[in-house]
Amino acid sequence: MEIQGTRFGTLEFDEKEIIYLNEGLLGFPLSKQFLMFPYGEDSSFFWLQSVDEPEIAFIVINPFDFFSDLEFAVEDEDASSLVLARSEDVEIFTLVTIPEGRPEEMRTNLAGPVVVNVQNRLGKQILCKDYSPRQPLIPDSMRSQLKEQARSSKGGHVAGGR
């Protein structure tokens, strides 16, 4: 199978690679089939590419790579709809937003993780009221340093005139 996307051009894939989000994502109800692939080599980021609407792609992460103290509870109803029998069959991803020109301000939606059964490729976005929908990925102290570095490199470039 293949899709023609605006971001990646032609993507060839096997049907067994599709993740099925039967309820879509919040705000994107028509996108129910997705492909997931690494953002880059050795990256903690992934692309979640809509098969139904090829112009739609999201950056996602495994939130446990960034936040070791997370605990997501998958309600029985959600586990049932995903046909989840074992906790080791679950993978959880969260959507990331990166403001243009301000990567140090990137955030992830911990309040709306996407839960995927890796055995049958069924997934669902669930709601977790205990977490923020705009959780910074970079700690405040490090964010300040990155902002300062960005300012100095821009300032140095402009001052140098070349």
Curated annotation (Swiss-Prot):
The keyword Ligase is annotated on this UniProt entry: no
Gene3D superfamilies cross-referenced by the UniProt entry: BH3618-like
GO cellular component labels: cytoplasm
Domain of life assignment: Bacteria
Alphabetical list of InterPro entries matching this protein: Flagellar_assembly_factor_FliW, Flagellar_assmbl_FliW_dom_sf
Record has ATP-binding as a keyword: no
Keywords: Bacterial flagellum biogenesis, Chaperone, Cytoplasm, Translation regulation
Subcellular locations according to the entry: Cytoplasm
BP-aspect Gene Ontology terms: bacterial-type flagellum assembly; regulation of translation
PANTHER family, per the entry: FLAGELLAR ASSEMBLY FACTOR FLIW
Family: Belongs to the FliW family.
Its biological purpose: Acts as an anti-CsrA protein, binds CsrA and prevents it from repressing translation of its target genes, one of which is flagellin. Binds to flagellin and participates in the assembly of the flagellum.
Subunit comment: Interacts with translational regulator CsrA and flagellin(s).
Protein's name according to its UniProt entry: Flagellar assembly factor FliW
Gene (name only): fliW
